[in-house]
Amino acid sequence: NLFQFGEMILEKTGKEA
């Protein structure tokens, strides 16, 4: 799902930041 993918990216970016 696109939503799930976006959520995963957000979490990844948040962890990276």
From Swiss-Prot:
Cofactor note text: Binds 1 Ca(2+) ion.
UniProt tissue specificity: Expressed by the venom gland.
GO BP, one annotated term: lipid catabolic process
Catalytically driven reaction(s): a 1,2-diacyl-sn-glycero-3-phosphocholine + H2O = a 1-acyl-sn-glycero-3-phosphocholine + a fatty acid + H(+)
EC code: 3.1.1.4
Record keyword Calcium present: yes
GO cellular component: a single term: extracellular region
The keyword Metal-binding is annotated on this UniProt entry: yes
The family this protein is said to belong to: Belongs to the phospholipase A2 family. Group II subfamily.
Function: PLA2 catalyzes the calcium-dependent hydrolysis of the 2-acyl groups in 3-sn-phosphoglycerides.
The name this protein goes by in its record: Phospholipase A2 1
Originating organism: Daboia russelii (Russel's viper)
Taxonomic lineage of the native organism: Eukaryota, Metazoa, Chordata, Craniata, Vertebrata
